[in-house]
């Protein structure tokens, strides 16, 4: 079905491998001279501020990385649905979602190499400290990249070759099922803290549900070449999640250091520093964010392809692709604020000063901009659902509810954006009557009000999605119009 594209893909593969290899060589070549510099030597590049350069590269790396980690999560699930239902439409859809990774993966690696080069060149002392603290983790981190690349290319380029559904021998199937059951038992014991090393409860749940459980399911399902391909996809997601958790743990250590003394020297096992208080909350938040981001980008791709389609069959396919992508995005977007609350709670429990700086101090306006973007995402998502309803025959009976949902979202959005106070100068405070708080609106800036309205926005989005789902459902016939024949038949029975 896709074999005609293979030579082009193989050529692209060689180019991507060359890009990745070049990035790794550049990192190695420039890292050692950077580490050889004197302490606290921080420099600019091309006259640009070093912080802005690192921020830009990190942000671009996160954008593409979120897409690369998010798309395989739902692509494998769609492939499993197609495999179990024997419906080639789902298999084709999963392949098309996966094909979007071909360019994004190489770009992610390129920006990752540039980010590493910028960090080691512009902040050699800091990166030297991080490398000495997490030297064991960094080697595992690099090996995980090789494992992810290997799994991704086998998963993508082996799609056609691994379509055979001829069952393996009964003995081989029994071996795989035994491994799956044994791994599931280990998962249960690990989940309830019966086995395994000491760790926080959220980290234990994260690793049990996203590492051990998927692998046990993958082994148990393996019975033919197609299910083996699905297992490779599951492995790809597990390795990608491990890469994300490793990066998040090192980022969390920068904000909530653990396992070190006042001088910053490691006093305990590196696992204590790795499993800091913010490591898992960031991982959970990013996991949902990656899934929502991947779904929205894939939906945008489907929308563009829908516009450029030449016939009704293609339009129907890409309309369905956009529907599935939007379903994934909404499913991840709805619990995302709760993951953000969880992360914020852990930030305040670790350092109230850091939390106050984020929400009411130096970064208060940045936090307001973030709130604006979060509210905009929900508003745009609802608008996408409403516009999608216009293409569904029979959904016009639900149009009357849209204005009420829109009103609730707009009012909630306004409350969500209302700040409790603003960082003002002395002159501005005196012009406001000696107070930096609005006499009425200050109450809308408190978290109880914001918690209420964000929950209302989430419920409104969920209600819009329910209307979108029920758009093509037929009306239920009232009992008064059904006649008495069913009643008589039931009574006779």
Model region roles, listed by residue range:
Residues 1-36, 176, 186:
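N-terminal secretory/membrane targeting signals
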């Amino acid at each position: 079905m896709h074999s005609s594209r293979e030579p082009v893909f193989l050529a692209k593969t060689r180019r991507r491998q060359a890009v990745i290899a070049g990035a790794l060589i550049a990192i190695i070549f420039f890292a050692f001279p950077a580490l050889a510099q004197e302490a606290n030597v921080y420099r600019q590049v091309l006259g640009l501020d070093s912080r802005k350069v690192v921020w830009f590269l990190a942000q671009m790396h996160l954008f593409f990385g979120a897409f690369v980690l998010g798309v395989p999560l739902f692509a494998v699930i769609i492939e499993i649905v197609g495999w179990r239902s024997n419906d080639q439409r789902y298999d084709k859809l999963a392949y098309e979602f996966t094909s979007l990774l071909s360019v994004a993966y190489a770009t992610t690696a390129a920006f990752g190499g540039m980010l590493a080069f910028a960090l080691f060149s512009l902040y050699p002392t800091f990166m030297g400290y991080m490398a000495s603290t997490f030297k064991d983790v960094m080697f595992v981190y690099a090996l995980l990249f090789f494992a992810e690349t290997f799994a991704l290319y086998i998963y993508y380029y082996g799609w056609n070759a691994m379509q055979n559904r001829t069952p393996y021998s009964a003995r081989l199937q029994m071996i795989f099922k035994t491994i799956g059951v044994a791994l599931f038992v280990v998962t249960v014991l690990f989940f309830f803290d019966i086995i395994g090393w000491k760790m926080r409860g959220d980290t234990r749940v994260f690793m049990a549900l996203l590492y051990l459980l998927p692998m046990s399911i993958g082994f148990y399902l393996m019975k033919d070449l197609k299910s083996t391909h699905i297992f490779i996809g599951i492995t790809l997601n597990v390795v990608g999640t491990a890469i994300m958790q490793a990066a998040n743990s090192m980022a969390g250590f920068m904000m909530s250091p653990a396992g070190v003394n006042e001088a910053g020297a490691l006093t305990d096992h590196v696992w204590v520093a790795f499993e800091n208080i913010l490591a898992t909350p960031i991982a959970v938040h990013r996991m949902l964010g990656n899934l929502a981001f991947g779904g929205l980008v894939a939906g945008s791709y489907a929308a563009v392809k829908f516009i450029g389609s030449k016939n009704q069959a293609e339009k129907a396919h890409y309309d369905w692709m956009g529907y599935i992508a939007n379903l994934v995005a909404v499913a991840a977007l709805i619990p995302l604020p709760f993951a953000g609350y969880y992360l914020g709670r852990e930030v305040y429990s670790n350092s109230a000063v850091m939390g106050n700086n984020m929400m009411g101090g130096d970064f208060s306006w940045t936090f307001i901009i973030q709130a604006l973007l979060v509210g905009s995402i929900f508003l745009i998502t609802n608008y996408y659902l409403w516009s999608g309803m216009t293409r569904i025959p029979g959904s016009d009976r639900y149009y009357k509810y849209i204005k009420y949902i829109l009103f609730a979202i707009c009012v909630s959005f306004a409350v969500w954006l209302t700040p409790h106070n603003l960082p003002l100068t002395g002159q501005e405070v005196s012009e406001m009557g000696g107070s930096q708080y609005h006499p009425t609106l200050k109450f809308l800036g408190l978290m109880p009000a914001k918690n209420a309205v964000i929950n209302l926005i989430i419920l409104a989005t969920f209600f819009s999605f329910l209307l979108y789902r029920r758009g093509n459902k037929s009306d239920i016939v009232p009992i008064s119009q059904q006649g008495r024949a069913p009643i008589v038949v039931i009574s006779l029975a």
